[in-house]
A protein has these predicted regions:
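Glycine- and aromatic-enriched mobile tails/lids
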Residues: 1-3, 21, 25, 38, ...
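Core beta-strand elements of the Rossmann-like FAD/NAD(P) dinucleotide-binding domain
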Residues: 2-4, 171-181, 333-336
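N-terminal Rossmann-like FAD-binding beta1-loop-alpha1 element of flavoenzymes
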Residues: 6-30
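Short beta-strand "acidic-cap" motif of Rossmann-like dinucleotide-binding folds
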Residues: 27-34, 214
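Conserved N-terminal glycine-rich FAD pyrophosphate-binding loop of Rossmann-like flavoproteins
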Residues: 33-65, 69, 223, 233
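Conserved redox-cofactor binding core of oxidoreductases
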Residues: 87-173, 178, 221-228, 233-234, ...
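Glycine-rich loop(s) and the adjacent beta-strand/alpha-helix scaffold that form part
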Residues: 181-230, 347, 355-372
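An anion/pyrophosphate-binding glycine-rich loop and adjacent beta-alpha core
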Residues: 204, 210-310, 372, 376-378
């Protein structure tokens, strides 16, 4: 049985930063992804926001709090916005090729929702470059990286991490891995609403007893090509691209990302016109080629039809400023368990996210989790292997049962269940007590069906069918948690809108948590340092 100080789940910016920081701190570090290595995810889609040309980060901090409808933890917002310029500098010194202004500094533009120009990027190569920089740092510090490793069970003793059970699809076996600390830093659950990926790490901790926070909040990405899962960076709008209806009438994009997504969602045949980007066009060359390969649309000559989809789920594993997963209250920690990036809910975004803040959140939470995990594991010993050995045997039996030939005349496959999930979500066009309860009833039925999903492949080697079964089951559980959290929030705030409670209420100025049994709880909103509001709720 392998034993590592720190195991990191994921392969995006947060996971790479966490793994590199942990290894740099002296911890033996293993990084695992359920898919092939090298997939950057969506965190870097809209660049990185930092107050490079401002005397202080106060405006960035206040824009973030306002966009989050005052549901952000203000001490976290202060810490992350204060470190934003440092994050830009680190990426630049490690090789990221920003677009530059006449002074040679990273070029910043004013993205929607920001009061000042502060969002920088590298055009369509931003995500690839961020991924490359992260991989180079991980290799530099000796992180061991493995792909096609599917996490099955988080093994713990009284909410203290012992290790985890993993399906190794490279060697075709179920194995146990001992660890002192586990950092969950893979994807969120936005893939449940379309054709994207659902992270397994969040569900892993959820099944182990961790209550998820703020699951009702998610944002729609406005520039999604209709009928596909291709999301275009909103940075195109800063370079001269415009959104209008098919008739040519330009849309009023409003002042926030939510306004833009709603305007596009309500428009008649909305399209993106990126034919006149001028000198900025070369920065988007690889994106234009990708769109042409996927859709046949030449963005240099044609407009692109749009249809907003859920692109970012804000809720996730509740963490403190060190990246530790908290349970019930800020004072209780699921010992040895950390989270970062898309799988976590740091309190930075609140009820909606600003462009450029998503990558900032991933980098900051990844660094915090990796640094603290390395320091903490240095003084810890490994737990007993007894529970882990039993969990491996149980997982082997469960997987073997799933792979057995099913002689039943009627079987349920992932595609059918996923289509039913999407249909249930699409039919819920607005949120109210009745519509959310109806959706929850449908989801409970799907959750029951998901327990007996049919697996066509019988081998453990590269069994993508089995991986999709796990993802489908996780997606349904995550959406159920989101609906239960939405039922508990009897108000409209940020990206979450209810028909029967159209106004925000001070009574719900707190975080809502929900566990696997459906028990709803609360987590207090954190003010700034010293217990004072940095920006009082309005």
């Amino acid at each position: 049985m392998e034993a590592w100080d720190v195991v990191v789940l994921g392969d995006g910016p947060a996971a790479l930063r966490a793994a590199a920081q942990a290894a740099q701190g002296g911890a033996s570090t293993l990084m695992m992804s359920s898919t092939a290595l090298g997939q950057p995810g969506l965190a870097a889609l809209d660049g990185l926001s930092a107050s490079i040309q401002e005397s202080n980060p106060r405006s960035h901090r206040e824009d973030t709090i306002r966009c989050g409808a005052f549901l952000s933890d203000q001490d976290i917002v202060a810490d992350m916005t204060n470190s934003a310029v440092k994050q830009v500098d680190l990426l630049e010194r490690r090789g990221l090729n920003y677009r530059r202004d006449l002074q040679g500094l990273p070029m910043v533009r004013r993205a929607i929702g920001h009061a000042q120009p502060r969002t920088s990027d590298a055009g369509s190569s931003t995500a690839v470059q961020v991924q490359q920089v992260g991989e180079e740092q991980a290799m530099r510090h000796g992180v061991v990286r493995r792909g096609d490793q599917v996490p099955l069970t988080l093994v713990h003793s009284n909410q203290s991490v012992d290790g985890l059970v993993v399906l190794d699809m490279v060697n075709g076996r179920v194995i146990g891995i001992q660890c002192k600390a586990l950092i969950i830093a893979d994807e969120g659950f936005e893939g449940a609403f379309g054709d994207g990926t659902v992270g397994l790490g969040m569900d892993l901790a959820f099944r182990a007893g961790v209550a998820l926070r703020d699951m009702e909040f998610m944002t729609h990405h406005p520039l999604t090509i209709q009928g596909t899962n291709v999301m275009l960076p909103t940075g195109l709008l800063l370079d001269g691209a415009v959104v209008h209806e098919a008739t040519g009438a330009e849309l009023d994009s409003g002042t926030t990302p939510l306004d833009l997504a709603r305007a596009i969602g309500q428009a008649v045949q909305p399209v993106l016109d990126a034919r006149n980007l001028g000198e900025a066009a070369p920065w988007w060359g690889s994106l234009f080629r990708l769109v042409k390969q996927r859709t046949g649309i030449d963005m240099a000559r044609q407009t692109v039809p749009l249809s907003p989809v859920v692109g970012h789920t804000i809720g996730g594993l509740p963490i403190d400023k060190h990246g530790r997963c908290v349970t019930s209250s800020w004072a209780r920690w699921f010992t040895g368990l950390y989270a970062a990036g898309e799988a976590s809910c740091s309190g930075f975004h609140g009820a909606a996210a600003l462009p450029g803040n998503r990558l900032l959140d991933s980098l900051c939470t990844g660094a915090a989790a990796g640094t603290h995990a390395a320091e903490w594991t240095a003084s810890q010993t490994f737990a007993s292997t007894e529970g882990l050995t039993a969990a491996v045997d149980e997982a082997k039996a469960d997987v073997s049962a799933m792979l057995q030939d099913n002689d039943a005349t009627h079987v349920v496959r992932c595609g059918t269940l996923t289509a039913s999930l999407h249909a249930a979500l699409a039919s819920t066009t607005s949120f109210s007590t009745s519509s959310l309860n109806n959706l929850l009833t449908k989801l409970e039925g799907l959750d029951h069906q998901a327990e007996s999903l049919h697996v066509d492949q019988s081998s453990l080697f590269a069994n993508t069918n089995l991986l999709e079964v796990f993802r489908t089951q996780a997606a349904i559980r995550m959406v159920m948690a989101s609906v239960r959290s939405g039922l508990a929030r009897e108000e409209s705030r940020g990206s979450f809108v209810r028909e029967d409670y159209p106004e925000a209420s001070e009574e719900f100025l707190h975080h809502i948590t929900v566990d696997q049994q459906g028990v709803v709880g609360q987590l207090a909103l954190k003010k700034g340092t010293g217990g004072h509001w940095l920006l009082a709720p309005q």
